[in-house]
């Protein structure tokens, strides 16, 4: 398994929050603390170093005690721009990402992804969960914003973004990628509206 010291964790908090009315999702209070702080507390014990990707309210994120990196690609280019910012700044061979609005990040995320990456000789590892479709039948759901990435792929990601690419799964398909099954799909629940925020706080 990849040593913890070889992995940098990256919290993706650089989006517009448009589905939540433009608010900064990572700074919304969830059970008494900002959502991004919940993600930080669950992710940081799994890695050797931490970064936060943010494009506004930088001082608020810096108060978490973790280096903050902004997108180098302009105009809120999506999560891949945040991932690139992390790849450009991390000093380790691997980068582990998680969005700021996922307060139940699995505590074994790094361990399971790194083990699968090594066993498959892959460059990227992503979680997969089984979730019901419209007919109630189980289907595979890839969780692409939670991923372990070989930092040597940074140059290829630059090329992809410069060519106008924005979809995570389209970029990861260019490389050897392994999917890793996780049983608890709610661990990857992200929060896109204030209503979902309140519902999740009450439910779990």
Curated annotation (Swiss-Prot):
Binding site for Mg(2+): 101
Predominant location: cytoplasm
CDD domains, A to Z: MobA (cd02503)
Pfam families, per database record: NTP_transf_3 (PF12804)
Annotated catalysed reactions: Mo-molybdopterin + GTP + H(+) = Mo-molybdopterin guanine dinucleotide + diphosphate
Oligomer and partners: Monomer.
UniProt record similarity statement: Belongs to the MobA family.
Name of the protein in its database record: Molybdenum cofactor guanylyltransferase
């Amino acid at each position: 398994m990849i040593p913890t010291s070889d992995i940098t964790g990256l919290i993706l908090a650089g989006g517009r929050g448009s589905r939540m009315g433009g608010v900064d999702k990572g700074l919304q209070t969830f059970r008494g603390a900002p959502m991004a702080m919940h993600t930080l507390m669950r992710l940081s014990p799994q890695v050797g170093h931490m970064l936060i990707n943010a494009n506004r309210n930088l001082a608020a994120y810096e108060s978490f005690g973790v280096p903050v990196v902004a997108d180098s690609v302009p105009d809120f280019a999506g999560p891949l721009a945040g991932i690139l910012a992390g790849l450009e700044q991390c000093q380790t061979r691997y980068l582990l990402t998680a969005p700021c609005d996922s307060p139940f990040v699995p505590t074994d995320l790094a361990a399971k992804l790194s083990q699968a990456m090594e066993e498959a000789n892959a460059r990227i590892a992503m979680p997969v969960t089984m979730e019901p479709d419209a007919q109630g039948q189980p289907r595979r759901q890839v969780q692409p914003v939670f991923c372990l990435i070989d930092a040597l792929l940074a140059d290829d990601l630059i090329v992809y973004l410069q060519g106008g690419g924005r979809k995570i799964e389209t970029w990861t398909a260019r490389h050897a990628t392994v999917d890793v099954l996780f049983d608890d799909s709610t661990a990857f629940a992200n929060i896109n509206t204030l209503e979902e925020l309140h519902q999740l706080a009450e439910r779990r």
